[in-house]
Regions:
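Internal catalytic or translocation cores that form aromatic/hydrophobic pockets or channels
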Residues: 68
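Glycine-rich beta-strand-turn "strand-cap" elements at beta-sheet edges
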Residues: 1-4, 40-65, 94-125
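Short amphipathic alpha-helical segments
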Residues: 17-49, 90-98
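Short strand-loop junctions, especially beta-strand C-caps/beta-turns
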Residues: 10-16, 79
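Short amphipathic alpha-helices within nucleic acid-binding modules
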Residues: 19-22, 77-88
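Active-site-flanking beta-strand signature of metal-NTP-handling nucleotidyl enzymes
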Residues: 5-12, 71-72
Length: 125
């Protein structure tokens, strides 16, 4: 039986190279609508750190902001659909364009939903 899952691919790049990462992520996002099993996606870029939500001391927060962090979040109706997308030649080529600018990652964590807000006409209620 298929199980819906969410994948979050995380990576960091040097300041000044974020435009290259954004272009690669736009290319990846462009492949998703035609992918079997794709349900949803979003691309996130860091802009700061929360002193309230972070356990890092001041110097740790500053060090962590030395790079630009990205999250490529995808939602799939099955692990098989996810794996088919990520093993494709097109995705691997796009990932290859990132290697020269990465400071960490990419790595992906897979999730299944534990708590979700109820939906009504595609809006949380």
């Amino acid at each position: 039986m298929s199980q819906r899952l969410i994948g979050q691919t995380m990576f960091s790049v040097r300041h000044g190279t974020e435009h290259r990462a954004e272009r690669a992520l736009q290319d990846l996002a462009g492949l998703l609508p035609a992918s079997a099993g794709h349900m949803n996606h979003r691309v996130l870029r860091s802009f700061g750190m929360s002193p309230l939500g972070s356990a890092l001391r001041d110097e740790g927060r500053e060090a962590a902001l030395g790079d630009v962090h990205f999250v490529f979040e995808t939602e799939w109706d099955s692990l098989e659909a996810h794996d088919e997308f990520y093993s494709s030649q097109s995705v691997q080529q796009i990932y290859g364009t990132l290697h020269s600018i990465l400071t960490s990652g990419p790595f992906e964590v897979l999730y299944d939903a534990v708590v979700e807000e109820p939906q009504h006409d595609n809006a949380a209620v």
